[in-house]
Amino acid sequence: MYHKNTKYATEKRDKMLNYISTRDVNHKVSSSQAVLDGLAAGGGLYVPEDLSELKLDYKEVIVEDYRGMAKKIFGKFFPDYGEELIGDIVERSYRDKFKAEEITPLVSVDGRYILELFCGPTCAFKDVALSALPNLMSEAAKLNDFQDEILILTATSGDTGSAALHGFSDVSGIRIAVFYPDKGISETQRLQMVTQSGANTKAFGVRGNFDDAQSGVKRLFQEIPRPCEGVSLSSANSINIGRLVPQVVYYFAAYKSLVDEGEIKLGDDVDYTVPTGNFGDIMAGYLAKQMGLPVGRLICASNKNDVLTEFLETGHYDKKREFYKTSSPSMDILVSSNLERLLFFVCGAEKTKGYMKSLAETGEYQISEEELAKIKNDFVGYACSDEEGSAAIGRLFEETSYVMDTHTAIAWAVSDRDLKEESSAKNVVLSTASPYKFTGAVLAALGEKASGDDRSDMERLAELTGTEIPDPLRAIFEREVKHKDIIDVDEMKAIVVQYAGEGKE
């Protein structure tokens, strides 16, 4: 059971920032309640009511180390936690959990910059946010005197699942169930999930793709917000504002590194190229820009599933298209959840609600020319094929000995194209995963035939490139498989009700 944290609840605070639903501005909650809820009533996503309240002097932020920057940024987004508790949460979340002291190191490669976001315990960018979310959520429960046990439901296209399972493992008062597509993720990603320990963790393969799993999870939030007495649902996907906000910090961290190395002057704009399918990672960049960070363009890099590229070019969102399984599976998504937040900021709640209704009923929507023009002030989109991504991996390794994964390769190939066509600003490519999570595709890009056995392929990649296999990935082959269930989408509800009721009789 949770009990109110009176130490922090009685702390004097400034005027609170409210959170509202993207589909109903009259639905208002505190920041901690938004973290607890995950998804707003009626299916909307929580956003800050007033973006101007997030403004800060970025120059005062980037003098700090990573944890110091996180404290300032978290404090803006989550004011009802109070300064002392935010500081405690950040220290618990980021101390001694990442192999790099700077958490997200920036590396200069071939005249561009790669922001390495894979230095955490599951070797993917999701670790940055999912190291913080369990602490944000458990403290939110105390602040709101929330008595229910929390059951986290999370759909994953690969990396969120392992990071969420690891982050929430054995966290008191919280259980987690992850749903992943049974085909279309790498064997390493699958093993990370199905071998995860923790008495409060479950992982289920879903027959279908990520969109099937994500739609199923969203539907459960509407149908069974309390699947049994004493248990409430929440989310660890980036639909949860507590998952999204920690990702804002590394945009500031990248800018700080460029300034500290003398690569840019204070005030210079920086472009960020982001490989994304669900629009969360790039949405964090938009929020960083709203806070006052000098962000130039946010370049959305898509694979063959190019629904976002078409939308950013034409304003037409159409999920009624062929779904492709690619070598960058974490981006194999046709329903991009976080785009709803951008629609709200550009179009308002009523229009956003209408667009989402149209998407649900017809599979598409079209925004106005004026709305698209506003979006194009900040975003541009490109798509690349597997072949272009593979060529980028091979070319960059041959020229610089730098090895990147298949998702980063899509972003690198996009930045290649963008540099030729558009901008002279410094360009930071967000690198979202270790190449050792996708060894078969990376080996193929380097001209080697993969064996089909991820363990052997990791050893071969290490030998070929002179790089080291990350310890967390090496360890998965020694762990026992604990989660073996493969289910149909229409079984998700019964599974969740059963899991929620365990131990409640």
Question: Where are the regions a protein language model picked out?
Answer:
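PLP-dependent amino-acid enzyme catalytic core
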Residues: 2-7, 11-505
